[in-house]
Amino acid sequence: MAKFSYKTVTRKILADLYTPVGVYMRLRDIYPQSALMESSDYHGSENSRSFIGVHPLASIAVSHGEVIKTYPDGRVEKEQLSAFGAGQGEECKLAISKSINDFISSFHVEGESKEFCGLYGFTTFNAVRYFENIPVKDTTMEKNDAPDIYYIMYKDIIVFDHFNNTMELIALQESEDPHSSLPELDELLKAVNKANVKPYDFHPVGETTSTLTDEEHKANIRRCIQHCLRGDVFQIVVSRRFVQKYEGDDFKLYRALRSINPSPYLFYFDFGGFRIFGSSPETHNRIVGNKAFIDPIAGTTRRTGDMEQDRKAAEFLRNDPKENAEHVMLVDLARNDLSRNCHGVKVDFYKDMQFYSHVIHLVSRVSGELDEHADHIKEFIDTFPAGTLSGAPKVRAMQIISELEPHNRGTYGGCIGFIGLNGDLNQAIVIRTFISRNGELWFQAGSGVVAKSNDEYELEECNNKLGALTKAIHIAEEL
């Protein structure tokens, strides 16, 4: 296998005159298929960075049972997963993790800030078709949908360190000449400093529609309650999709969303034919060195805007028997998921209240030490998808979801984020997210249904989770 060796060339400047959004707006027309990743959590140095990736250099995708790899020299490799002897389940997990690991190992990067060079992209919820015996609907509506798994390696990365107030431009150079990438950095910096940036308008067209009516969704909730009462599952996360037509620039919608619903994971990925952007509060899986983390969110209530009312709502949420039972169940599921590749699994914090623009969430953190020979990609796959977006037990819950929901989920409930060449990774759950394609926005929300659930309450929870998205649509048009 060809080995692509690079050395980083970097330039660091003060960032007080720049913002990630402002820089991205200057670059996106010059460098197509770029990506912006931000975090609103600037309280400590570990979460205080934002990233812009430009110049796609290589990529790996899994789609319709085929692994597709593109390399810097223009080569494209395609191989059916069946060629690995893989159908579904453990064999397929191993085949996909091996493909990703082999792809990563074909790159060698040295130099300052090399830890930011890696794969940026997503794993859709539909990828469960490879990992378990889950029938995923492939309807006409989804024929132009994204690959099941898609990650890109960018040639140039811009890193904003909000803690130290710096902006670093990083370029990958092939030759031994330390000056070979300097003209490229000069061009990038020139684009960053471009004086005029014209923001474009955004206009929703018509009313927001859903693939399910309120009554149809409540009927699905009642079916889930019956499955819980029969003992088929303890919990099912059932969802519904919404569609909004629009004209104009969807990046303005991202700007509106990030302004009203700042979250640990803010992202805008342009993949050419479609874009994924959102404001996710939830870490699915993070690996730093030899430690792995899952941060389950289970338990949600609406914010009123009144501090005293919100305090009472948070206290009620913390003590509500139904919400607590659900939270305990999903923390245990996270512990079990990590235990497949980790030892010393423990709960770092439990039932922490986190306040967002429209909702209050109940959050815990579970961590573990990776086993000595653990495969980091396999560890991620073994935790996928999040129990908070599927249910418990996971496999049976996903089978019921596939039966009840009228379409496949696409990226909703999957993951988006970074896989480092050194094995570190950081993946957010794709919630509070828009998929934009051909003048249409798709967005989705759900709720965790247990035996004691009430269909009206679960419908309200689903609508509460949509609050930030629907408000962002209105603000993007007005401002």
Predicted regions located by residue number:
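Extended alpha-helical targeting/anchoring segments
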Residues: M1-L479
